[in-house]
């Protein structure tokens, strides 16, 4: 930009504030703020010309260029008078006239310097018009005019006009303000103020000076009259009259994206190129688009641009896709170069055809020279030679080929070494170059390589390739040696041929060597000449001797290259062991077989062991070792996967001085859970320091006696077998080693006990590493064999035998050899899990089969036999009477890592052990007792229980082998650990816990805390075996909104137990309800209302039933009617609070009985009913079920067993299996299934990128998701989510700081499609966030309370949404995000700047950000104890992530908050809430209908109508509606569920969907369904037909009642106080193990705002104790709600608690402490007294018939259910 000068007018000390330069013509598609040249008014060329001829005079001073606009003496800037702008010493019109305003009446140039411009001026009017051109602030203009402009005929004028800025047109209307701002910003940019204009985020590049501030302020006022400004601009200026930059910032953010940007994105996404146009044209087109986007502040990365270009390539350019597919560092320039090369190649081929070459005279005199070959004539064209006659291309500097072998044709390959210099001789030239001076030595850069091309090398005698992809007929190399330029050997992996398919169908083949140790793929020119192919470097082609062009060659850098597209890929599979066996090693054993036989030991250990003869009957030469070092065993990879290597060098140095067996290392591993009682849960290992000999012993427990027995055994073994004495034993500091018993044992025997020091795990490395090794082997062996987990110790023992027999990499001998023992006899070893057939020499019948299928485990310790597992008999035997089962068509395993069959090899190894030996096998058990296996009914098995009488006949059935394929593997069932022995007699007590594996439950998502049971309402379902088994009845306690927003979360199960009596039919004709009583004196049934399945005595008859002495009996003084409703409060205010005032306006059922305050005994004549205690319809088990044992022909399961699946896939895919059973069944036990509900995976409602876009067949939906995707990308870039200026290399960043990312898509409730870019916070490292920070959202009770108060006080309710809320919160930690997968930046990372969705800390960061803004900028305060509830004197705000609900009496107060929020956040008004008619909201999933001063209705009809039919549940199959979700008297069958694996997973997934949706609805507003929902949630892992029917029935009831709403009416205006009431109820002992169900319902001013149903945490011993527990659970939440109500509404509050237990009220009121039966009960009651008296709580009695909390504790009959709910749910 030319330097320009501004002249000062000596007659004008105060010049104008205006400056202007004419803007250049800018295309409209380049800048949304550009001003078209056609819109510029004409200027007076003559006056401009005159002004341009002025010279600097002594009276004027030239102002030097100042790019920073810094004035040495900045002056204050008082604003001028302009309409409504504030006045601060304005100039008068006369002064303005003197200030040269009159000069602006003519289109002449102002002569004053901008540094002398005064900010004080008078607003121009018709007498003082605006100037047409204004001198700029700087002498540099950002927009020079093109010299070829339309005004070029007046060069002088044009030159001068270039120094002027065209002022923006005056602002004329409020609606066009955004358009005018574009011109005004362009005006400021042309005035050299672009770097101080804020962007839409309010960021500026530098601070402005006072003069610049005055310049902007004055020009804005001059062209934008105050009365024409929009309201929001006026509001800003009213606060700060000079804050023009804020106005510009907000204006920029409001501008819509330019249409040209969208067009450029579409053009870039739809690029296509096939070579029809020149490559240069295509490059210019793409570069222009990218440049335009860059001008609009949209940076397109090279990676993204390359991907879009590659997508549109076709024809010969298409192969570039594969070339760039695996590249991460894409460069756009490199891709354009590749396209240009291909375009040039095609162009050359079109010009150079064989018929044309012979016609041109320029090719006729081409010299032909034959190279130094005897067999083949080779012709080359037009290249320069060295002094030798052999033609040479440019040499590759990375290799000098030198051969030391004979070629196939016995021709010796000439040795030649290429110098490291570019040209070693002055006369040596590259082909196709003129002779020049020799070049200096240089190093080849790896960037010189041309990808997917072969370097044509004249110095290489052999062709070398780095990839075997193109190598045909490859054979392993054993003879050829190649050296590089430094005479270093280059290893050659294989020898083969390269097949070329040139143009015109010419095919040829040359020999090539495969090595990955070269920089380029080298194509030997001499190899080409042997095939009559020559290189013409004049025309850059490969030709035949007759001149036919075969292919073009490319000059790139200093070399010539041939494209690999002419190579034919090799489709021959890699060399396999089969191929090697057939061709070279017919009699050798394949390495995978030996690897399996030797316990999956590593390659080095096996090879070294064979060299040292540690394994007999097998030599190293007997095994095929090719590729053994690189062989990957999938079972080893899975079973031995580790995080990192164990600490090396942890052994102390002095330990090496001991002799063999003097220094032992020991450690205990365990426990292994979920095993049968007979299987060991621990093992203790010993390792000798010197020999590294290893022992393992099984343990069932870690008691002192068990450990002592093992130490006694091993010390005796070492003393007798090795004649050695143990001196030192090193152990850790576990209690099993540091106890007095073991210490005394060591002291008596003179053994030093060496313990590790505190936190010194390194000193115990030998034992720790042994345990890790044994467990790795154990997992691998079990996985490979598919055997059940209870055989885990057999795998450990097998591994110990193998490890003692192999040489470790650090030793020269095996442990057995060090110990002086013979090597392992390989003929005695079978692969772990090898299928065998065991001879049954004592069958039950002579016609029964003599063979029993089994699986070999390990050699016996106590005999010469083998330990074999017999699944059909559930036992292991020690026998030699077995034969190996062969199957020549099976695979080794499901990974198919080789396709060999090892039967023949195995037969050769074990040939002399294949015959049966009679009467010599013994049975093996884990306690090492040996017995005979002659009698298979001796019951030495893994899962042993006394068998019924007819078991033997069943086990020896003639069809035993036919039924054998249906394999059942029993795993433990779980029972409650708290059950005492008398509770489960006559079965034995089990202490082990089960483990029900649910793969889906551990993958993602949270957990749901669930403790409920489920009702069943079906008269058609009959209990199996005429009994009513129980089910767990623990209720879900999910009052927090956080727990229910995403369906099922945090399901915690509890134990099942209890007994249940048969159902007593209720007489529906009588109006008298009977309560159950118990003859046991210790149980008080005075207020028992827990069992709706039995007749219940009404409250009037209650006194007559209380004939059982109890500690909870009311004192005599409270048995009269005078004390029926005791008032707990002693203060003066209590005299105005009565039971009627508490019960008034509550939605209780209308009954004709006496008031609850009347306790007159009207039922004293009714006889007392004696009945046994029964459980509710869905809890406990029949007494008959407890007292009887199963008498089945099949062996009964133990109490801690359940049958688990043997996968069919495991049977089908194992190579060494005996039989393939039909489809196996999975047996599920009810108790184990319920207790296995640890964490249920929530149903995924979102879609991945491939599901939503890539493979989405719904084009309309796909388009919507694509649109949402682009919108999300734009938002992320707009919010500066990550640092776009730099990409970080993945290898340079700490992996802990790297967060994975992904796109998720979903459809919102309003039908819009949403895309969200999220971080994988579920795998975020704990060190990258502060675990103390919590992401808070408004509690659902707080929202319901706020809505209730809003109804009673006629509040306006406004709903807001903040877009991309989390992205407004900065992130403090240093974190890096993986870019989205579709960008292809696999090795690059982005530095996060904002709190991306999904991060652990994002929610907490956003909460702190919005909380700070609401407090500091909106004058709000957070309510103590209730997060995300904010209030001030006028407005209450409930915050749920990015949703805000505003409550206020004055709608303008809400609007004021909205205005403040919009200054900082992109705030959308979902529903302003104005008007007096009914307004509908969708607030956090609730569909709310609200009419101020009248009512509020909460429901989910629209959502349920849409979602329920999609659950694939048959709705209304019989066309009639259900009247209740369930009824009492129905029981969940406890019989084990036998189901296919796939069907089981499918049903569990279905249960998750159904219960997840039901749970969401229940905790929103359908509190009447909570008991039923949570009951079924406990049975998700037990999806029997009965459970599914009950679930379908619940969904059906929800469908039939989907239009039901929670109805609230405005409180009566005569009520001056707020009334908060909790209604409590408990069902005594109706839950498993006699636990009680408790429930509470909370009401504010007669409106139900919440409900809770859960199981009592402790077992209650009476109904009163259960009721006390229920009341104690309600009081804390009641107090918290009371505090919230008082904060939100300053009215006085009355707190009441209603219960139908008089004894509970008596205990709360009484001061007598002598009757408390135990300390716990007493402290509970005393605390309850303190809470009631200290919190001004009124406790009153309510009739059971009116107790609406009854629906929270038990299933009710239809009539009772409707009676208790129809007042508040209808």
From Swiss-Prot:
Gene Ontology CC: cytoplasm; nucleus
Keywords: Aspartyl protease, ATP-binding, Cytoplasm, DNA integration, DNA recombination, DNA-binding, DNA-directed DNA polymerase, Endonuclease, Hydrolase, Magnesium, Metal-binding, Multifunctional enzyme, Nuclease, Nucleotide-binding, Nucleotidyltransferase, Nucleus, Protease, RNA-binding, RNA-directed DNA polymerase, Transferase, Transposable element, Transposition, Viral release from host cell, Virion maturation, Zinc, Zinc-finger
Post-translational modification (record): Initially, virus-like particles (VLPs) are composed of the structural unprocessed proteins Gag and Gag-Pol, and also contain the host initiator methionine tRNA (tRNA(i)-Met) which serves as a primer for minus-strand DNA synthesis, and a dimer of genomic Ty RNA. Processing of the polyproteins occurs within the particle and proceeds by an ordered pathway, called maturation.
UniProt: Mg(2+) 3 binding residues: 1625, 1667, 1700
Binding residues annotated for Mg(2+) 1, in chain numbering: 667, 732
CDD domains with a match to the protein in the record: RNase_HI_RT_Ty1
Chain spans, region Integrase-type zinc finger-like: 579-636
Primary localization: cytoplasm
Reverse transcriptase Ty1/copia-type domain span: 1353-1491
Site (Cleavage): 397-398, 578-579, 1232-1233
Record localization: Cytoplasm; Nucleus
EC number: 3.4.23.-, 2.7.7.49, 2.7.7.7, 3.1.26.4
PANTHER family, sorted: TRANSPOSASE, PUTATIVE-RELATED, TRANSPOSON TY4-P GAG-POL POLYPROTEIN
Domain note: The C-terminal RNA-binding region of CA is sufficient for all its nucleocapsid-like chaperone activities. Integrase core domain contains the D-x(n)-D-x(35)-E motif, named for the phylogenetically conserved glutamic acid and aspartic acid residues and the invariant 35 amino acid spacing between the second and third acidic residues. Each acidic residue of the D,D(35)E motif is independently essential for the 3'-processing and strand transfer activities of purified integrase protein.
Function description: Capsid protein (CA) is the structural component of the virus-like particle (VLP), forming the shell that encapsulates the retrotransposons dimeric RNA genome. The particles are assembled from trimer-clustered units and there are holes in the capsid shells that allow for the diffusion of macromolecules. CA also has nucleocapsid-like chaperone activity, promoting primer tRNA(i)-Met annealing to the multipartite primer-binding site (PBS), dimerization of Ty2 RNA and initiation of reverse transcription. The aspartyl protease (PR) mediates the proteolytic cleavages of the Gag and Gag-Pol polyproteins after assembly of the VLP.
Name of this chain's protein: Transposon Ty2-OR2 Gag-Pol polyprotein
Gene (UniProt): TY2B-OR2
């Amino acid at each position: 930009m030319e330097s320009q000068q501004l002249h000062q007018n000596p007659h004008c000390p105060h010049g104008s504030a205006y400056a202007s330069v004419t803007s250049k013509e800018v295309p409209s598609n380049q800048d949304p703020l550009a001003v078209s040249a056609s819109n510029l008014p004409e200027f007076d060329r003559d006056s401009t010309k005159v002004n341009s001829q002025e010279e600097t005079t002594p009276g004027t001073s030239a102002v030097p260029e100042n790019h920073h606009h810094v004035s040495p003496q900045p002056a204050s800037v008082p604003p001028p008078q302009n309409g409504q702008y504030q006045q601060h010493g304005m100039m008068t019109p006369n002064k303005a006239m003197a200030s040269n305003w009159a000069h602006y009446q003519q289109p002449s140039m102002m002569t004053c310097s901008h540094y002398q411009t005064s900010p004080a001026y008078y607003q121009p009017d018709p007498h003082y018009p605006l100037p047409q051109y204004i001198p700029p602030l700087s002498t540099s203009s950002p927009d020079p005019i093109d010299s070829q402009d339309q005004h070029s005929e007046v060069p002088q004028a044009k030159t001068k006009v270039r120094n002027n800025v065209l002022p923006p047109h005056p602002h004329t209307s409020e609606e066009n303000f955004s358009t005018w701002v574009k011109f005004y910003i362009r005006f400021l940019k042309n005035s050299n103020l672009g770097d101080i204009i804020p962007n839409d985020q309010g960021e500026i590049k530098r601070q402005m000076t006072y003069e610049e501030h005055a310049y902007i302020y004055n020009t804005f006022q001059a062209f934008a009259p105050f009365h024409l400004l929009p309201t929001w601009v006026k509001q800003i200026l009213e606060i700060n009259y000079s804050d023009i930059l804020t106005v510009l910032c907000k204006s920029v953010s409001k501008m819509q994206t330019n249409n040209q940007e969208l067009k450029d994105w579409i053009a870039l996404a739809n690029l296509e190129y096939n070579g029809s146009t020149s490559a240069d044209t295509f490059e210019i087109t793409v570069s222009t688009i990218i440049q335009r986007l860059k001008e609009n502040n949209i940076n397109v990365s090279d990676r993204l641009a390359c991907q879009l270009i590659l997508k549109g390539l076709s024809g010969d350019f298409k192969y570039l896709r594969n070339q760039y597919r695996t590249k991460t560092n894409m460069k756009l320039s490199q891709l354009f170069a590749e396209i240009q090369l291909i375009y040039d190649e095609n162009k050359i081929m079109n010009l150079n055809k064989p018929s044309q070459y012979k016609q041109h005279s320029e090719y006729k005199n081409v010299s032909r020279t034959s190279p130094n070959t005897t067999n083949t004539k080779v012709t080359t064209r037009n290249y320069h030679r060295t002094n030798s006659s052999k033609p040479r291309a440019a040499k590759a500097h990375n290799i000098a080929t030198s051969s030391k072998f004979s070629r196939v044709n016995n021709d010796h390959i000439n040795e030649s070494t290429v110098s490291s210099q570019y040209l070693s001789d002055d006369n040596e030239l590259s082909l196709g170059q003129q002779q020049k001076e020799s070049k200096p030595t240089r190093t080849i850069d790896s960037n010189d390589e041309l990808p997917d091309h072969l370097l044509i090398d004249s110095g290489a005698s052999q062709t070398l390739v780095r990839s075997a992809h193109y190598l045909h007929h490859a054979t392993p190399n054993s003879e050829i040696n190649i050296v590089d330029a430094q005479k270093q050997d280059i290893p050659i992996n294989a020898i083969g041929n390269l097949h070329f398919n040139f143009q015109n169908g010419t095919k040829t083949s040359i020999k090539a060597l495969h090595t990955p140790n070269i920089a380029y793929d080298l194509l030997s020119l001499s190899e080409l000449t042997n095939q009559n192919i020559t290189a013409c470097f004049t025309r850059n082609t490969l030709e035949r001797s007759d001149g036919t062009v075969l292919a073009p060659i490319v000059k790139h850098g200093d070399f010539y290259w041939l494209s690999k597209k002419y190579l034919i890929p090799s489709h021959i599979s890699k060399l396999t062991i089969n191929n090697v066996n057939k061709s070279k090693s017919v009699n050798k054993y394949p390495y995978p077989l030996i690897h399996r036989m030797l316990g999956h030991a590593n390659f080095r250990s096996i090879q070294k062991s064979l060299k040292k003869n540690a394994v007999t009957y097998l030599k190293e030469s007997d095994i095929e070792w090719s590729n053994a070092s690189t062989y990957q065993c999938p079972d080893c990879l899975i079973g031995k996967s580790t995080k990192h290597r164990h600490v090396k060098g942890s052994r102390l140095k002095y330990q090496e001085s001991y002799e063999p067996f003097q220094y032992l290392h020991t450690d205990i591993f365990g426990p292994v859970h979920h095993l049968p009682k007979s299987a060991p849960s621990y093992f203790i290992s010993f390792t000798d320091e010197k020999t590294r000999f290893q022992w393992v012993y099984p343990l069932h427990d870690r008691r002192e006696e068990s450990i002592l027995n093992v130490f006694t055994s091993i010390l005796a073994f070492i003393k007798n077998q090795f004649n050695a004495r143990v001196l030192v034993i090193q152990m850790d500091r576990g209690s099993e080693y540091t106890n007095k018993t073991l210490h005394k044992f060591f002291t008596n025997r003179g053994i030093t006990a060496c313990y590790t020091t505190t936190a010194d795990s390194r000193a115990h490395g030998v034992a720790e590493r042994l345990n890790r090794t044994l467990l790795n082997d154990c997992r691998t062996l079990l996985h490979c064999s598919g055997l059940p987990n209870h055989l885990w110790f057999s795998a450990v023992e097998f591994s110990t035998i193998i490890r003692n027999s192999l040489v470790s990499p650090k030793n020269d001998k095996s442990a057995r050899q060090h110990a002086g023992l013979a090597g392992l006899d390989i003929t005695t070893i079978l692969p772990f899990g090898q299928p065998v057939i065991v001879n049954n020499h004592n069958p039950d019948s002579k016609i029964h089969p003599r063979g029993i299928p089994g699986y070999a485990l390990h050699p016996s310790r106590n005999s010469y036999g083998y330990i074999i597992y017999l699944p059909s008999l559930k036992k292991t035997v020690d026998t030699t009477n077995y034969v190996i089962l062969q199957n020549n068509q099976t695979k080794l395993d499901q990974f198919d890592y080789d396709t060999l069959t090892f039967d023949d090899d195995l037969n050769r190894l074990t040939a002399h052990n294949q015959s049966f030996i009679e009467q010599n096998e013994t049975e093996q058990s884990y306690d090492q007792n040996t017995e005979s296996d002659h009698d298979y009914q001796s019951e030495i098995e893994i899962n042993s229980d006394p068998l019924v009488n007819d078991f033997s006949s069943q086990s020896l059935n003639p069809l035993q082998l036919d039924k054998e394929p249906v394999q059942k593997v029993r795993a433990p069932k779980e029972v409650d650990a708290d059950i005492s022995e008398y509770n489960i007699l006559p079965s034995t007590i089990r202490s082990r816990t089960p483990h029900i594996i649910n793969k889906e439950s551990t993958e993602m998502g949270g957990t749901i805390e669930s403790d409920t049971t489920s009702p069943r309402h079906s008269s058609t379902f009959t209990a199996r075996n005429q009994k009513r088994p129980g089910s767990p009845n623990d209720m879900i306690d999910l009052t927090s909104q956080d727990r229910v927003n995403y369906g099922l979360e945090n399901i915690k199960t509890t134990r099942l137990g209890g007994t249940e009596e048969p159902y007593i039919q209720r007489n529906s004709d009588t109006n008298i309800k009977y309560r159950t009583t118990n003859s046991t004196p210790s149980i008080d049934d005075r207020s028992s209302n827990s069992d709706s399945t039995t007749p219940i005595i009404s409250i009037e008859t209650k006194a007559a039933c209380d004939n059982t002495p109890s500690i909870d009996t009311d004192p005599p003084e409270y048995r009269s009617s005078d004390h029926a409703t005791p008032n707990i409060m002693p203060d003066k205010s209590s005299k105005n609070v009565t039971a009627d005032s508490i019960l008034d306006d509550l939605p209780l059922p209308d009954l004709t009985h006496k008031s609850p305050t009347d306790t007159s005994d009207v039922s004293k004549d009714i006889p007392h009913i004696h009945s046994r205690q029964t459980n509710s319809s869905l809890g406990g088990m029949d007494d008959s079920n407890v007292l009887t044992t199963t008498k089945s022909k099949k062996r009964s399961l133990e109490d801690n067993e359940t049958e688990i699946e043997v996968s069919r896939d495991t049977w089908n895919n194992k190579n060494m299996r005996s039989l393939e059973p039909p489809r196996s069944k999975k047996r599920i036990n009810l108790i184990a299934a319920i207790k296995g509900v640890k964490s249920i995976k929530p149903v995924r409602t979102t879609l991945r990128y491939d599901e939503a876009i890539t493979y989405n067949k719904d084009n309309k939906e796909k388009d919507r998701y694509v649109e949402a995707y682009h919108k999300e990308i734009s938002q992320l870039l707009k919010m500066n989510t990550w640092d776009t200026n730099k990409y970080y290399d993945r290898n340079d960043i700490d992996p802990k700081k790297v967060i994975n990312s992904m796109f998720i898509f979903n459809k919102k409730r309003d039908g819009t499609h949403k895309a969200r870019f999220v971080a994988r916070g579920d795998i975020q490292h704990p060190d990258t966030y502060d675990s103390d920070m919590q992401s808070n959202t408004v509690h659902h009770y707080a929202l319901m309370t706020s809505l209730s108060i809003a109804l009673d006080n006629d509040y306006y309710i406004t709903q807001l949404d903040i877009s991309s809320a989390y992205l407004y919160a900065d992130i403090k930690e240093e974190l890096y995000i993986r870019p989205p997968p579709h960008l292809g930046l696999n090795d690059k990372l982005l530095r996060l700047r904002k709190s991306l969705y999904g991060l652990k800390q994002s929610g907490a960061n956003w909460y702190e950000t919005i909380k700070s803004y609401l407090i500091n900028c909106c004058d709000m305060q957070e309510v103590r104890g209730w997060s995300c509830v904010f209030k001030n004197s006028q407005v209450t705000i409930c915050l749920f992530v990015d949703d805000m609900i505003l409550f206020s009496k004055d709608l303008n107060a809400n609007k004021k908050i909205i205005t403040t929020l919009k200054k900082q956040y992109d705030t959308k008004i979902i529903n302003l809430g104005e008007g007096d008619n009914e307004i509908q909201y969708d607030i956090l999933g609730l569909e709310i209908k609200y009419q101020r001063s009248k009512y509020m209705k909460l429901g989910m009809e629209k959502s349920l109508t849409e979602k329920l039919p999609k659950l694939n549940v048959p709705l209304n199959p019989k066309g009639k509606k259900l009247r209740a979700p369930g009824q009492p008297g129905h029981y969940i069958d406890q019989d084990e569920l036998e189901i296919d694996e796939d069907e089981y997973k499918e049903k569990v997934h279905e249960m998750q969907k159904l219960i997840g949706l039901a749970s969401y609805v229940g905790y929103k507003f359908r509190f009447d369904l909570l008991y039923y929902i949570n009951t079924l949630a406990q049975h998700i892992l037990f999806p029997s037909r009965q459970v599914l029917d009950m679930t379908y029935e619940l969904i059906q009831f929800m469908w039939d009642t989907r239009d039901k709403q929670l109805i609230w009416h405005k409180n009566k205006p005569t009520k001056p106080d707020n009334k908060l009431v909790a209604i409590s109820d408990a069902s005594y002992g109706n839950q498993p193990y006699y636990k009680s169900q408790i429930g509470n319902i909370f009401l504010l001013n007669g409106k139900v705002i919440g409900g809770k149903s859960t199981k009592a945490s402790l077992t209650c011993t009476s109904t009163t104790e259960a009721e006390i527990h229920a009341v104690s659970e309600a009081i804390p939440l009641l107090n918290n709600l009371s505090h919230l109500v008082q904060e939100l509404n300053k009215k006085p509050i009355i707190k009441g608690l209603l219960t139908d237990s008089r004894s509970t009220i008596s205990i709360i009121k009484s001061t007598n402490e002598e009757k408390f039966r135990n300390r716990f009960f007493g402290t509970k009651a005393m605390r309850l007294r303190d809470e009631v008296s200290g919190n001004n709580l009124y406790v009153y009695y309510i009739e059971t018939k009116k107790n609406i909390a009854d629906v929270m504790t038990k299933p009710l009959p239809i009539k009772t259910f409707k009676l208790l709910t129809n007042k508040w749910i209808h």
